[in-house]
From Swiss-Prot:
SMART domains: KH, S1. Residues 550-609 form the KH domain. One of its GO terms (cellular component) is cytosol. It comes from Helicobacter acinonychis (strain Sheeba). Mg(2+) binds at residues 484, 490. This is Polyribonucleotide nucleotidyltransferase. Its cofactor is Mg(2+). Its EC number is 2.7.7.8.
Amino acid sequence: MDFITINSINKTEEFALKQVAKQATSSLLYRLGKTIILASVCVERELVSEDFLPLVVQFLEKSYAAGKIPGGFVKREGRAQDFEILTSRLIDRTLRPLFPKDYRYPTQITLMVLSHDIENDLQVSALNAASAALFLAHAAPFKSVSACRIARIDNEFIINPSTSLLNQSSLDLFVSGTKESLNMIEMRSLGQKLNALEEPLMLEALELAQKSLKETCTLYEETFTPHQNALLFKESQGIVFNERLLDLLKNQYFNEIIKGIESSALSERENVFNEIARKISEAHSEFNLEEIELSLEKVKKTEIRRMIIRDKIRPDKRALEEVRPISIESNLLPMAHSSILFTRGQTQSLVVGVLGTDNDAQTHESLEHKAPIKERFMFHYNFPPFCVGEASSIGATSRRELGHGNLAKRALETSIKNKDQVIRLVSEILESNGSSSMASVCAGSLALYASGVEIHDLVAGVAMGMVSEGQDYAILSDISGLEDAEGDMDFKIAGNLEGITAMQMDTKMSGIQLEILYQTLLQAKRVREHILKIMHEAKEKIVINFSHLPTTEIFNVAPDKIIEIIGQGGRVIREIVEKFEVKIDLNKPSGEVKIMGNKERVLKTKEFILNYLHSLDQELEQYAIDEVLEAQVKRIVDFGAFLSLPKGGEGLLRKQHMERCQVALKEGDSIRCRVISFNKGKIALDLA
C-alpha cells in the first residue's frame, strides 16, 4: 500500500494506492479534505470487433457519503441522478480523446463517492481521481490529464474555489486537459444578472486554467510514473489499407464519393456510400465488405479535409464562416404558453414554454447540497429518431439528451430576471443535421420572451468546428452533422452581443491550443451577431397572448386560516382547484396564498376564498362562551366527534369529554353541549 500527497493550487490531494479493490486493473482512494472517492479501472483483454471505443465511465454518489438516507419510498440508491450522469459525461469527454484510435479493449472507469464535504468540488475531484487511476492502469501510453475550475469574484479570477466561493461567483468555468493543451471545457455565467463574459476575459481565464493544468499534470506524471502497471497493450500501427482498393475508389468512384459528401441528409449520404460499397463488392470479389467500407471511409474523410483546408469550401458548398439559412415562426401551438419553431438549414427545433407554480418545481437530492433543492427553470431536450430519418422506438431520456438540455439551460438561466418563476422549456428536435442544442438555445430564448418572462437580453448559440492537417487548420461556423463527425473539434458557444453565457468544447484530438480557441471565440462572436439580428427581427413580430398566459395573485390571510382553506383531509382546497381550474400554493407560517392560472379564474378564486373565510368568521360570531346548544353528531373520529351546530358551522367534542360522561355516540345522534372555547377558528365543545 502506497500513500501519495500532491500539493497543487488551492488544494492538497491524497492518493492511497493498492489499499482497496485490488482485483481491478488499477484502483485508488482519492482524498481531498473530508471528500473520499474510490476510483477503479477495469480493462478486459479480449478485443471487441466493433469500430468504436468501448469505454464506460460511471460516477456514483452514495447517500451515506453525506450522512444521509435516500429520500423516497425505497431507501437505497436507484436510478442515476442528473448530476451523476452529467459528471460521468464530463469525465468521459475528457478521457476519451486520450485513447489510441485503434484501442478496442473494453474499459470501465468507476468513481464512487464514499465521503463528501460540500465545500469541495466533486467534479474536479472525480476527474482527477479517474485520470490518476487510468494513468496507473497503463492500459495504453496515456498522457496525464487533470481538471480545474475557475470562478470570478469582484473582477478577480480564482482557481479551484470552494463551493461557498463559487456561489458568490459570476463565472463557472470547468477546464480539463494535459500539460500541453486543453481538451474539454464547460462554462456558464452565474448570478442575478446576465453576466456574459467578454472574449478577452475568457482567454485570460483559459490561460490561467492552462497554467494550473500544466502544473498539476506535471506533478501527476512525475509522482505516478514509478507506480504504473506494466504496459498492457502497445499502440498498434493502425489499419493497413489495400493501396489497390484505395486507387480504385479514387479513380473509378471519385465522383460518386463527392456526390455522397455533398448530400445534405444523413440518410441520403448513407445510401450513396452503401451503394458504392455494394458495387465494389459485387465487381471485385477479392475485397471483403469490411475493408471496402474502411477504405471508403478513409477516402471520404481525406477528401472532406482537403476541400476544407485547401479549397476553403465545405461539403455543402458554404464558406468557412457562412451560416445556414435561418427561419423563425412563433405561436404555433394555441394551448401552450409559448412556442417557437427555429430552423437553421436542416436542423429544426420546436421549443415549447410553460409557466408553473412552486409545486411544479423539480426537487433534487444531491451530496452537493444539505437539503433537497428546487429546480425552478427546467430545459428538457428530446431527440426522437425520426429527426435523422431513423426507424426506431423512442425510449428513456439518453445521456446525450440530458447533456444537451443542461447546456441549453445553462446558456439561458441568467437571462431570466425573476429567478423565482417556475418555467419549463421543452425542445423537440424535429430535424437534425448538426448544432441542434444551439438551435434549442435560440428558440428557447425567444420562447421565454413569448411566454411573457422578463429577460435581460436574447441569447443565441452556434456550434463551431475545426479541421486540421499538421500545422494547417480551418475553423468552421455552424457545423453540420458531417463536419461534426469528420472534424476535430465541437465547440458550442452561446451568449449575447456583449459576451458568452455558456460554452462546451469537446475534441477528438489530444487537445487544442489556446490560440485556436481564441480565434474560434472571435469567429463565433461574429456569427452570434448575425443570428441575434435575425432573432431580434423575429422578436418584434411575436404577439404575446397575455389573455392565455397564467397570472399569479398573491395575498395574505391570518396564518391560522390556512388550515380552513385546506379543509379536512384537503377536501376544501381540492374542491376549489377543481372548480376554478387553478393552482394554489399555501404558506402556513406566513399565511401567504398564491393562486396561479387564467386571470379571470384567479380573481374569482381569490374572491371565493375570502368570502369563504368571512362566512366562517360569521358562523363563529353567532356563538358565545358557555352557550348551551342542541347539536347533531356529524362524524366520529379517533380523537372525538364533530357536531353540526344549529346556527351553522361545526364544533369538536373531544374524546376525553365523552369518556368522562361515559357517553357512546353514533352519527345522527342529537346531544346537548356547551361552547367552552374558540381556538384558531374552531369551536370546542363539552357535554352540557
